[in-house]
Every structure is written in structure tokens, then in C-alpha cells.
């Protein structure tokens, strides 16, 4: 067998005859056949058989062989325990599932059962993308959600859990509403009953925005089984307290409960009660729109360059995640939006207090994730320290808010509620727990409880005594070393290792007296090496035992203290989670106020109208980039009204390439997202009637996997818009029809514009190079024209980036080609062809249909003239017998034909 041999799956290998350790491995593999088994052996996690091949290839580590099974070498690979997180992270990103099998006892404990006893091992967790909790495996500023989709009686539901913070949400949606909800949640892993994967539309949705899709046995989503699991997860007798969940909602939550039972090995996370929502509560943004607008990631997957990166001034991890969540799901409820805006405005008005609060906030840790790790048994003293320090930050913030500079301007509802939640005095148990941690935790906290040294001195007298013996052992050992050297007259040292414990060591050349009477009665020989000889004494052995026992007792007492405090944290989980959320709310509101001040943003007016009225608005991302380059940004106005009362509902946007049409479209879509997320907007003023659905058709690419061209993808997205947009929707369309023949494209664009105006009756911006669409302004009641201006100056094209009423006079495509560096001869030839085409287009005949069809007629007349009589040359050519001519006759015929042409 060699490293490149095709591996046989471990669960297909006959375990008969396995050694006790390998028998343990086979047992674990049988329990998790589709996972890589991280099998703990000492300081390493080992992988065997096909797991070893897979891990070695994925991680770039060595694959070797160790021992044999049924006469064949056992493939093996391993990673050190101290670096396991990095390897786990890579495997999870590559789509693997990993079962972590830990040693459940110390090898010394196993030996007590017999010299051949094997250390007990068990799977303590199964690591999947949606169940990560370690800081090293997570993005501190981003959520890591596990989602589940269920369908029941025509109703769909999406449930999600953020295991690292305990947040749970369940949303009842129509089947077609699953895609925008999943796109907003952006789960790392999505659970779905296997029978649903036969649904093509749902499978496509999961492929686009479901992260790793994990099929689950359909029986797990059945109502009765799901209800039982959800009750067990929350430790309740009935689900009535969660507000009358529908069968689909229970099914989705049941899938999550089943997955957590399997992956967490019986440890229940500290989950909050499910927060119920519906697709009617948030703005629907489909995956294509979300991608094109680059809300939290650019289309290349980077955070930098996104809307979120442009406005994020949060100073806590929880605040960063909350801001991202708000941008992902803008609200529809005007009152709720105003509550968020009130909080931002209060911080805008109280600048000095805001700055002081933000400085204090920087001391807050990620308390929600620390609590989750503690509840799952993965936390350590540092997590307790995080809770202690963050609760202290909350206390300080609550006290500072009480000293607001203007007593006539108390915090608005959202902030008042948050500040109260941060006052431990309002929760006696939380206040006592904070006091316990302040007095009980020492200054230097290890990551793991088993490392010890984290309980403060003076807290537990018996611990101090054990520590005293352990820590004073150096002095005692040094004194004994001096005494033995003096009594023996031999230079010696007392040393320690894990095998012999404490021992006396002398060089081989000086050790002979220790073997002779009377010293041999004191010094008991233990080991001889090449250059040293090792001994022990009765006194040293006794001291060794007492020191070891003291260290063990000290560590055991510290671990017991940790477990006590961990349990207290678990019992106070609700109060800690509420405090954590309150900190995040304060961070988000203050950070948005900070950004508003930096960006010159204003409070939007969001109401129940159908208006969209932006004055001197700017694109937040582009403006930031332009400012960094030291250049001015040109703001623009945009007015739309679906009702047609104050403005047109459809604006046709024309202008040259590179003039900024796409930026203008995206800018206005982002204004709506910001406003309904509860953010200020970069504009002189902005009024928005609530947008229920946002659609963007800006840019497209091939979907090679499904055999779809760019134009096909464009039409699919356009069809989605035309079938779903309503009067409260906002639609931005860019260059519809450009991916096909000119007349086909124009016809499609024209028909789409008519449908948006007459059927969908929504607010829409329609950017196009089909200037013929500008005539729609005179044909339809609620259509206007806007153009992004440019001018020619000394033969060069200057972009003004200014949106002005009226259509553009031309597209300036040849000038843009020149700016792009197209070779000069090509540009000159393009100008010649353009001039010729434009001269042919000057047909006086105009039709009442598409204006370009008048051009079509003119071209048709030019390209298909009436059939004329044959010329003399044609008649002569027709009479030639080409096959029967000699070379000389052919040459004479050519001269004769030439003469006819010149005659």
C-alpha cells in the first residue's frame, strides 16, 4: 500500500481483530460515518484510514502509517492539539464535518483499572459550519447562523440559530419568500428535509444562498417529533409560550433541535426563546439584488467596498453584528424605524456624551459568545473574565447616561430600555454574580480551566494552603539540595521530570561515593545515563508526593470553582444576553451618529406615502472613495412617486457610458436600505414612503453550471421583477435588453418599461442606451426623463456626473472607447461608421410605434432596392464558358470585361 492508494472507507473495514484503541476508533466512526474523526491521543488528534487520506490532502500535512489492521498498514495523519483550531477552521471551510473524540480521563486514571486498560474516549461534539463557537473559528464582526427550511401544508418556514450568541429566530413565509430570507440570513449551513431537495426551485435557492446544505431525514421535521425535540431543547412542557407556532415553524425548529442534539453530544446551549417574524416585517431583497448592491460584501466577496464597511463605526463585536443584521433586513414598520432613528438622533445631539460612551464601550468584550461557550462546556476562565469586564462596562454606561447634559432631553425609548438593562442593581442575581467574579477571578486568566492560576488569592483558604505548599516547594527543594550535597560531599542537583518526579542527579564521575556505605543507605539508585546517575531519597520521595498532591488539590479546587461560576453564568443566561443586546444597541446607535457626523448625513423622513424624494444625495461608498482620492463628489436629486401625485413613478435615465448611471441607480437603492434600517442618509434631505420589496437588475453574468447565458440570466431576473413588484416596491433596472440584437433588445426594454408603469405601478429607475425610450415621457402619464450629463471640451469628453431633467442627446460611445485606450485607427474608423449610420437614420418618416422602427424602415429601403435589369458586364459574364476556356481566352475575357466597366 502507498500514500496514493485508493482508501477504503473506515466504516467498511472489518473491525474484527482490532486493538483496543482501534476498536474505540471504529466505534466512533460507526457513530459518525460521514465525519472526519479527530481522535485524541495525548497531545495530538489522529486521523485513520480514509480520514487520514482526506485530511492530509486538504490540510497539506504528512500522511504516514502506524501499526497494522488485519495484516495491512493503517494510514494515519495527525495535528497537534494546541494548533487544532486552525486545522479545524480549514477543514470546515472546505466543507468537511469533523467529529472531535476526546480523552475523557487522564491516562493515570485508566491505569488504576489495570495496566492494559485503555483511556476512555467519547465524541464531545461534531463540528459543522453552522455550529462553530470558538473565537478562532469565527468572524467576530459577523454572524454565523445555522438555518433550517421546512414546508408544511403549502406554508414555508425558515428557522435560524446563532449558536455562538444564543439568538433564535423563526419566520413564517410563503414558499417564494424563502430566497430573500435566506439571502438576508446568509447562513453558513442550512438544514432541509431530504424529500424537499427534489423541489427544483427550492434546490436552486439553497444552492445560491444556503451555505453548506445539509440534508436531514424527513421524519425529523414531522410535527410530533419536531415538537418533542424543541420542548427538550428548551426544557419546557409546552410550546404555547412561544406564541402558537405553525406546523412549518415547528418543523424548522425541530430540524435545528435534532442537529444540535447530534452535534453537541447532549450539551444544551443557552438559547433565547425564538423570536417570531414574518416576511411582511422586513424589506424583501432577493439574492441577485443583494449581490448587485454590495450591502455587506462586494461581488468579489470582500467586506471592504461594501455599504456596511462604509458606515460601520461600531467598537464592539456585538454591535458590528447587529448593524450588519439591520442592513440585511430593513424594517417596514414606520414606528419601529423611527425608534431607531430617535436613538441615532439623540447621540447626534449629545456629541460629548457620545464620545465618552464610545471610549468606555471599547472595553466591552464579546459577552454573548463567551456565555455560549461556557454553556456548551467549551469556555474557560477568560470567558468568565469577559463577562465580568463587560458587565462592569455596562454599569459605567448606565451611570454616564444618567448624567446626560440636558435633563430636558432624556434618552429615547430604545436607549432608555438599553441603559436600564445594563444596571445590575435591577437584577439582584446578576449584581451578585458580578461581585463574585470581581473578587474571585485573578488578574491573569488562562484559556483553559485545567491550566489553573485564575482564582484570586484570599478567596478560598484551603486553596491558598495548597498553593502555598506547591509554590514554596522550590524553596524546600533548594534547601534539601544544599543539605544532601553538604552531607554527601558530592556535587549534585535535584531535578524533575514527568517520569521520575523529583530526583537527585550527579555526574557519572562524581557519583561513586553515593553507591558506597554509608551514603548508599540514603541515596537509592534510580537510573544511570551516559553522563549522569540519578537517585532518590526517602525524604525527597515524601516531599515529591506532598508537592504533587498539593498541586493536584489546588488544580481540583480551581476547576471546581470554575464549574461553580460556569453554572451561575448558565442560570443567569437570560439576563446576560439581555445586557449583551443592550450594549450592542447602544453601540449601533452611537456609531451611526458618529458616521452621520463624519459623512454629513441627515435623518430621513420615512412614512406611509409612495414618495421617494432625495435632494443632493450621495452614494456612501463611492463618496468615501472619491474623498480619499481628494476629489469632489457631485450630489444628485431623485424624485419618484408611485401614486403619481408629486412626481413620476418611472424615470428613464440616459447618458454616456462612465457618466455614472449605474452609480446613480445603486445610490438611490442604498438610500432606501439605510433609511429603513434606521440609519441617517447622505443627502441634504430624504423622504421615503416605505419600500416593501427592492429589486435591482444591474449587471449580470453567465450561469454556466445551469447552461444560462448572460442574456438569459438578465431575462430571468427581469421576469422575477415583473411578476413580483407592486406599488410599494422600488425597482432599479440597468441596460435591459443589451445582451441581444438591437431591435429585440429595444422592444424588450420598451415593453418592460410599459409594464412597470402600467401593471406594476411601482417606483422605478430605468437606465438605458436606447434613447428612443425617452419618448415614453410624452406617451405615458407618470414617466420622466433624467440624464447624466457630459460635454465635449477640446475634443475630449468630460463627465459631469450630474443628473438633470431631460434625455441625453447622445451616448458618446466612441469618445469613451478613446478614453479606454482603443487604438486610434479603430476609433477613427468607428467615427466614420457612426457618422454614416447617423446620416442614414435621418428618415423623415416617424411611426407612432417604436421610434427606432422608423430607422428600421429606412435601412430596409436602402438595403433592399428594387430589382434592376442585368448590366452588360453581368450579361457577358453569364455567357462565358469558364470550364472550356484556355488560359489565353480567359485573359482576353478579363480585358474585355474591364473595357465594358470603363466604357
Swiss-Prot record:
Among HAMAP family, the record links this protein to: MutS (MF_00096)
Q: Which UniProt keywords apply?
A: ATP-binding, DNA damage, DNA repair, DNA-binding, Nucleotide-binding
- Give the Gene Ontology MF terms in alphabetical order: ATP binding; ATP-dependent DNA damage sensor activity; damaged DNA binding; mismatched DNA binding
Give one Pfam hit by family name: MutS_IV
- What GO cellular component entries does it have? cytosol
What is the source species? Caulobacter vibrioides (strain ATCC 19089 / CIP 103742 / CB 15) (Caulobacter crescentus)
The protein here is known as DNA mismatch repair protein MutS
Could you confirm whether the keyword DNA repair appears in this record? yes
Picking any one GO biological process from the record gives: mismatch repair
**InterPro entries reported for this sequence:** DNA_mismatch_repair_MutS, DNA_mismatch_repair_MutS-lik_N, DNA_mismatch_repair_MutS/MSH, DNA_mismatch_repair_MutS_C, DNA_mismatch_repair_MutS_clamp, DNA_mismatch_repair_MutS_core, DNA_mismatch_repair_MutS_N, DNA_mismatch_repair_MutS_sf
Q: Can you tell me which residues bind ATP?
A: 655-662
Provide the function of this protein.
Answer: This protein is involved in the repair of mismatches in DNA. It is possible that it carries out the mismatch recognition step. This protein has a weak ATPase activity.
Q: Which family does it belong to?
A: Belongs to the DNA mismatch repair MutS family.
